[in-house]
Amino acid sequence: MGHSDSSKTFRILMAGNPNCGKSTLFNQLTGLRQKTGNYHGVTVEKAEGIFHHLDHSVKILDLPGAFSLGGSSEDKQITSRVLIGHEAGDRILFVMDASLAERSLQFLLQILELNVPVLVAVTMKDVLEKKRVQLRLDLLSNEFGILFQYVNPKNGEGIKELKDRIVSPKAFCLPIRSFPWDSERENFLNDLLNSLSTEHSNSLKFVLTNSLKELSGEILQKGLPGLSLFSETPSKLIREKFERFGKRFTYLEELTQKSIYIKKILSNAIVGDPIPNERVLSKADKILLHPFWGLVSFLGIMALVFQALFTWSEMPMDWIESCVRNVGTFVGDFLEEGPLRSLIQEGIIGGVGAVLVFIPQISLLFLFIGILEETGYIARASFVMDRFMGKFGLSGKSFIPLLSSAACAVPAIMGTRTIENKSDRLTTILVSPLITCSARYPVYVLVIGAIFPSKNILGIFNVQALTMFGLFLLGMIASMFAALVFKKTFFKSDSSYFLIELPAYNTPSIKSLALTVFKKLKAFLSTAGQIILFISILLWFLANYPRIDSSLYPNLTDAELKKIQIRESYAGHSGKFMEPVLKPIGFDWKMGIGIITSFAAREIMVSTLSIIYGVGGEESTDDLKEALLKDTDENGKPVWGLSNSVSLLLFFAFACQCMSTLAVVKKETNSIFWPLFLFTYMTILAYSTSFIVFQVWQLFS
């Protein structure tokens, strides 16, 4: 049963059900030797990695999780196409969830029909042990003719042994045919195969077998996964044969036969004394899945997350502030007074450093979202939110992309590919940018930290943290009402049904969490960092030129000269030009400059204010907060008050200030109309909300 290919360089296709530990295992095998991209012609993320072991170089492709070699969503179609259209020499590493063995084996049976060398890594052994049962892998190996091996991706147990197996020439085995198809079906398949050429015979065999599931033949008309691999003549012949004969094999018959076969195998392979009533919900699920208390629990968990963002990040933020200040001082000691020193200290160090200070909060956000995902809570929150979101025209399938937007809208929008219903998917894409993302946090933290008091309510929750949580809730509520409007106008259709199998509770893998935070933080810095650096240098030039003649102001201090310089600069004139439009929502010309630059990326607002207020490398972020509070207009009144600060927060909550988001919307929708529509409606919403709140506030103040 072995596969004798001894090549030291080969490719492995990793397949398995969602939430089976496949991606965690992928991280354990490849570490940091990963790269991401997109599959050709689609926007589905492609995760590839390499690991070296015993003089072997193994390339691993982590395929999207799926339950079968079918499905209508874009990511599941990719899994089908890659596996069915595998390249010569490819091997399949199937990741099987031992706690959901029957479901995993349903998918494995389909993969075995491809006749490709397979090795099975079995996860969730600890879940079985808690139920006091064991899964005998030796019986499964004998039944299918392939090797099964336990591995724990969370703590690394069995990883070395799995690597040894992977590079062993006898590890990946060609399966023996075990599934007992009835003779009538076999005769039909063989008859059809004999009438076609032998090209792609293994893949063709699977396509034909899988086609028997469809009673109506509808999938054949839409394009069965894998059918496009063959030329027009075989495809036409397949359709004709199935029209006359193939339809008599129904999906229910297929499912029933396989289910009986799998249950028979597992009746012998699963041994032990199982805990009675194991299907009864745990005490935690009785609360977390409750229609009311589940929603309350979700809000409470998110409130604690934002509380931690403020309290836990304080020390590392202070440390980064100190580092930025010391770097500015160090560089300044080697440079003479002049434009170059100003550029490096105020433009580069001050501009970029002002955003780097908020890295601890962004990292904590990525960490908390990763923990919620790995523990299995996100799936439960999706279940609870399904009923609530149904009132607004969406299903629980939209919840995970929306919650992912709390980190970044770009991968969240790409994550909507799992939504089969096109109107639901497009609606989710258009409302996802309303969710508070990590790029908004630097602006929120700066303004909230400067304007709102740092005191506790009930001795637990910080006022600033509650304000941040309120902005998160505002984004969620706005996205729901926007979805309702879109579903009642542009996308009038029924929402898709939401079916989900709740995963077992898991202890998060520290290594997997660290890799997740590292990759997301790296992506954030590599994309936003380049834009911030470019805008900071450009803005420094616009804020410092044309130079004023300081001799005309002999009695003014350096700080007063700095104010005049910025006011008379290119940036100052641009802000003054925008001021009539921004004044009704409470913004002065300095805020106007920040608004203009932040349309490239929201976090640039902080860099812009840092440069405009002359906070350079020798200052800290606290000095920027003080500069905001001390700033006065021509009449001596404070520029930054509670009313226009709230107006600014609302503008940033609703405006689409992210070129990357607009770019990915264009790519996902394959249309220029929808990103333009997104930008327009969010800008109008942001301005209108800020205008109403500021004007009403002024009316009653």
UniProtKB/Swiss-Prot annotation:
Keywords: Cell inner membrane, Cell membrane, GTP-binding, Ion transport, Iron, Iron transport, Membrane, Nucleotide-binding, Transmembrane, Transmembrane helix, Transport. Residues 9-172 form the FeoB-type G domain. Its main location: membrane. GO terms for molecular function: ferrous iron transmembrane transporter activity; GTP binding. Coiled coil: none annotated. Gene3D superfamilies: P-loop containing nucleotide triphosphate hydrolases (3.40.50.300). InterPro entries: Fe2_transport_prot-B (IPR003373), Fe2_transport_prot_B_C (IPR011640), FeoB_GTPase (IPR050860), G_FEOB_dom (IPR030389), Gate_dom (IPR011642), GTP-bd (IPR006073), P-loop_NTPase (IPR027417). It comes from the Bacteria. CDD domains: FeoB. It is a multi-pass membrane protein. One of its GO terms (cellular component) is plasma membrane. Disulfide bonds: none annotated. NCBIfam families: feoB. Belongs to the TRAFAC class TrmE-Era-EngA-EngB-Septin-like GTPase superfamily. FeoB GTPase (TC 9.A.8) family. This is Fe(2+) transporter FeoB. It comes from Leptospira interrogans serogroup Icterohaemorrhagiae serovar Lai (strain 56601). The gene is feoB.
